[in-house]
């Protein structure tokens, strides 16, 4: 190649003089920076100390949210890159808005007070939930509108499951283990409530908040059982006792 390009005399070529150097030889200061002067900056994280820490944290967070959106959409294995890109952007924008609202409206913006149902002081989580629940509904509506534009109902459910780490299936499985011979009607009601919880929960930033939303709908499920001939407290007690007996039996083996 070089002989052709530079018009070299091929008779003078001597391949014995050709050496192949490892890539690491190109690193002037060693492969891992071993030859760098003492005190030299070795990572971008150290450079960040000289910049706006809040802005740097947001940049890192943005990158993390973007990766999350990309990974979630990639799991759908869409054949249309344009639709996939649109879905990624919709999810990324929603995740950012949820994060920004949460960070800009801390629990301290909610006055201390009592829970009117229990009479107990509002917890930090209670106040976080109140603050975050005030996020404009348009944020949620925009996400769902955009997802419906490019995804099927089944694909949207898969994305919502990503937001809530599969809590619908996990919680339903728990009810099926606790409630003896759970009927089709009961299963339909429980699944309906859990899906409502899932869609509401995507507008909250962390797992404690997501779990708190699911607790609201789990309470409705348990009230449903009590109102339709079941005794939730007794069923749960029986389930716990059964599990304890099973563990004892396994321990004796």
Give the predicted meaning of each segment:
Residues 1-57:
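Alpha/beta-hydrolase-fold serine-hydrolase catalytic core, especially in secreted/extracellular enzymes
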Residues 53-253:
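Charge-rich (acidic/polar
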